[in-house]
Amino acid sequence: MNYSKIISGTMNWGIWGNNLSTKQVSELIENSVEFGVDTFDHADIYGGYTTEELFGKGLIESKIDREKIKLISKFGIMYPSDKLPIKVKHYDYSKDHIIKSVENSLINLKTDYLDCVLMHRPSPLMDINKISDTVNQLLESEKIKSFGVSNFNPQQMQMFNNKIKIDCNQIQCSLTHLDPIYDGTLDYMQSKGIKPMAWKPLGEFYLKKNDQNNRIREKLLKFKKKYNCSESQILLSWLIKHPSNIIPVVGTTKIDRLKESIDSSSINLELIDWFEILEASVGKRAP
């Protein structure tokens, strides 16, 4: 499956964030596609199980054909909300729930198929054989075109990769969250051809004041002048340079910020600059 270089994350489109109107969603979809972002990331739980429906209404109102975009969704998290009055957040990867979740997403997103469906988080009770059989059933029915996972470590990916092809893994990865670079996650994905999608790709840079971010900021001031771009573009281009071909999932609903994110994919950091930025994040030289 080929995705756009930047993926538009929809978690904050609805009541969990910017509470966009149907018209605003429609315009955002149209503008995103115009600027080259044709892939939209969803999860059944976003907006307390309401954001997919909002997107679907916006898609119908837009001038965009379904075939011109790619829709990703995630299932498995049972999240207490008005639409799901349960007491305990948990994970459900039973056959019935997987099928029901995918079918609900199809209805809400106003589509006949999902380009990729992801297990939202690993569960200590996930049954690999039952999940693989169910996903294969969905693939054969053409309700989904590919299968992926989210927040999986190399061992968990390996278990499923022996049963069913994993197209992608959504992971938390940024200049302030380097675990996937060092714990073998990106190494494994690169060796198996699994596409990494990075959620929260700007990390904690704009959210926290600490020594790490102060060091990073000093380098960004230097390199945004050299490359004639913004701080955010340096943060994204630093991720994109990784040979595993990381695709940032960007959560902005502002079209100028989205275009800025797309433009970051054309910035090719020099090797020594990439390591200088890494050194600022870690706080010491590479070993």
Can you annotate each of these PLM segments?
Residues 79-92:
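Surface-exposed, active-site-proximal loop segments in enzymatic domains
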Residues 20-24, 50, 54, 89-97, ...:
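Alpha-helix N-cap and loop-to-helix initiation/capping positions
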Residues 67-80:
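A short, structured active-site edge motif that brings together acidic residues
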Residues 106-125:
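Active-site groove signature of glycoside hydrolases
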Residues 122-287:
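Beta/alpha (TIM)-barrel catalytic core signal, keyed to glycine-rich beta->alpha loops juxtaposed to Asp/Glu
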Residues 1-70:
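N-terminal binding-site loop/beta-alpha segment at the start of enzyme catalytic domains
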Residues 19-32, 93-109, 130, 153-157:
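Short, acidic/polar
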Residues 2, 58-70, 106-110, 139, ...:
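Acidic (Asp/Glu)-rich catalytic clusters
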